[in-house]
């Protein structure tokens, strides 16, 4: 059976080659967690679905991978999973930090129990974790899974403090000699993102609202909170990948700026980041596979044998105005081969790049688009125009557009996570007076990831059907655009299979 599953996933034309993918099996959700640099290796954990040990147990657990270069990954044994001896029914999101003794420590959401702690002592590979004997250190009620939301709310309303916080995707860090934990809200208590503090990781005090003002409305999923330069940054999932930049003072977060990476969820969700030995803040997010849904897990695995993809690692930094900069890691350049360079290209209307085509490649160019009403590039385009994914910029509207309306003639695949209003997604992008439009585009079978002027990092899943849907086309409307240089590379696969 294992061989048959492996054969299926190897034949899947939509399985990415250099974006990390689960070796096999189910990861839906595929939330990355516990990103941590330790003993010369990058460690990353993510949620997978395993065999359910008891009725009402989802079987969610933390898988574990590590790498020396952020590109090639070693698979480790499953790190945390629910068992007969643990109170939780599933292991949900959390993070890793160093405790006061310098020991790698996990705080995670244990479904049905609460926020819990585990530590890894004397293990360079971070494969062995000891749960805290007093787990859950921040408990919540154990409730029957067949209750509807109204009954669930009735149960929790009877508990102390349960109008003040909920257990949801904790994030813990050490500030000075004090541990702090965000435990996000859910839809029962919008705007209630609670902050706890502790001196010993066992006894926690509820401090109240995490936000000093302008709280996030609705759920605050997968929060990731860290210092960046002179500011603090909160990454989270709401209507897509979002972030808030501000200050943490007087034990509250004071928001100043808010931005978006993806819109209406789309492909990207569940941000997670770490700091490496070079001081880089490196971030990942999970990518939905829209060919499946929450209610179709078993059928999907039977058909495709896998589900779970991550974005490319991204480096986050702040510019002189404390605006967020986002760019791909330099290590990706080591995958390049078979370069093609085109110079001094005049684009007026459409120009098909005959010697650049493919479904696993990188494209890079810098242009001045101001003489046209819009300038862009079509990738994974078919010769008959029935399939194409369009990336374009309008100087007049100061908008960058990601148009997925013709990405696949298979509407069933595209409808998995997109609605009609989301198929053309627009992001605000204002170029300075002498600033060019700088594009880095990564195509990886069913993934398109676009970095624009280090200001935008957009990602989507596409599922072209036509074997001819590998063309690259430049275009301009309402004027001519000069392309001084366009570079392309094919990229070596980095996944073992």
PLM regions with names:
Residues 1-222, 227-266, 284-342, 378-383, ...:
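Beta-rich carbohydrate-recognition and catalytic domains
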Residues 3-6, 249-266, 272-497:
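Beta-rich accessory regions
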């Amino acid at each position: 059976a294992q061989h048959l599953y492996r054969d299926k996933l190897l034949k899947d034309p939509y399985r990415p080659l250099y974006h990390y993918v689960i070796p096999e099996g189910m990861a839906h959700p595929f939330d990355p967690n516990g990103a941590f640099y330790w003993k010369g290796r990058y460690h990353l954990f993510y949620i997978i679905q395993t065999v359910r040990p008891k009725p009402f147990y989802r079987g969610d657990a933390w898988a574990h991978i590590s790498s020396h270069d952020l590109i090639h990954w070693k698979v480790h044994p499953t790190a945390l999973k629910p068992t007969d001896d643990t109170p939780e029914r599933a292991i949900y999101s959390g993070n890793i930090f160093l405790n006061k003794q310098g020991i790698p420590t996990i705080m995670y959401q244990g479904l049905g129990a609460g926020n819990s702690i585990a530590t890894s002592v004397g293990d360079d590979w971070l494969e062995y974790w000891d749960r805290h004997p007093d787990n859950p250190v921040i408990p919540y009620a154990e409730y029957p899974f067949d209750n509807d939301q109204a009954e669930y709310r009735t149960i929790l309303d009877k508990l102390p403090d349960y109008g003040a916080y909920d257990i949801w995707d904790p994030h813990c860090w050490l500030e000075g000699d004090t541990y702090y934990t965000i435990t996000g809200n859910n839809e029962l208590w919008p705007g209630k993102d609670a902050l706890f503090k502790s001196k010993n990781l066992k006894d926690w005090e509820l401090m109240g609202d995490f936000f000093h003002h302008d709280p996030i409305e609705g759920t605050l999923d997968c929060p990731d909170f860290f210092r960046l330069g002179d500011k603090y940054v909160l990454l989270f999932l709401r209507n897509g990948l979002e972030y808030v930049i501000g200050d943490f003072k007087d034990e509250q977060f004071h928001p100043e700026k808010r931005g978006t990476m993806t819109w209406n969820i789309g492909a990207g969700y569940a941000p997670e980041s770490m700091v490496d030995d070079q001081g880089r803040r490196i971030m990942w997010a999970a990518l939905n596979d829209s060919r499946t849904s929450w209610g179709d897990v078993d059928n999907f695995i039977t058909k495709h044998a896998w589900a779970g993809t991550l974005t490319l690692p991204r480096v986050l930094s702040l510019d002189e105005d404390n605006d967020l900069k986002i760019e791909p890691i330099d290590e990706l350049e080591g995958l390049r081969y078979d370069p093609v360079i085109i110079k001094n290209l005049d684009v007026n209307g459409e120009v098909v790049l005959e010697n650049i085509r493919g479904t696993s490649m990188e494209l890079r160019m810098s242009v001045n688009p101001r003489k046209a009403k819009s300038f862009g590039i079509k990738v994974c385009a078919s010769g008959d125009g029935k399939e194409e994914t369009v990336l374009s910029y309008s100087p007049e509207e100061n908008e960058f557009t990601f148009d997925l309306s013709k990405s696949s003639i298979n509407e069933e695949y595209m409808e998995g996570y997109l609605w009609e209003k989301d198929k053309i997604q627009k992001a605000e992008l204002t170029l300075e007076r002498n600033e060019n439009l700088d594009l880095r585009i990564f195509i990886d079978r069913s993934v398109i990831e676009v970095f624009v002027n280090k200001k935008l990092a957009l990602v989507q899943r596409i599922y072209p059907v036509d074997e001819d849907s590998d063309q690259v086309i430049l275009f301009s409307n309402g004027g001519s655009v000069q392309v001084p240089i366009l570079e392309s590379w094919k990229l070596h696969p980095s996944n073992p299979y």
